[in-house]
Amino acid sequence: MFVYLRTKHYKMEEKKDYTPEEEQIARFAKALGHPARIAILHFLAKRNTCYFGDIHDELPIAKATVSQHLKELKDAGLIQGEIETPKVKYCINRDNWEIAKKIFGEFFKNCACKKDSCCK
């Protein structure tokens, strides 16, 4: 005995790629997603440059953890590091900082809740 099953073919909707702006804001947001990284940025913003040891002395975390947070900020492009053997000097990447300010500003402006929306 044969049983015929009726099958439906569903057209798979193509998933859209994220825009470069969405990708960039996600990278910045990820880098800003930890209080230690925010503290590092506050610390660097008050100075032109500073060394790893200065940053470590300011934060209540291990050196290895400071390194990981600096790497995350550097990978996102929010800071830059310059080797001055045997030390590394860090500063805020001003160009990318301006880009971050612009795209976050646009993001919040464009995603604002309308008065008649379900947001309260």
Model-predicted regions and their roles:
Residues 1-25, 43-46, 94-120:
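Amphipathic alpha-helical dimerization/coiled-coil segments
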Residues 23-62, 84-96:
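N-terminal helix-turn-helix DNA-binding core of bacterial DNA-binding proteins
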Residues 54-55, 63, 110-115:
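Juxtamembrane helix-loop transition sites at the ends of transmembrane segments
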Residues 69:
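Residues within the DNA-recognition helix of helix-turn-helix
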Residues 77:
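Glycine-centered, phosphate/nucleic-acid-interacting loop/turn motifs that mediate DNA/RNA or nucleotide
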Residues 81:
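Short beta-strand "wing" residues that participate in macromolecule-binding interfaces
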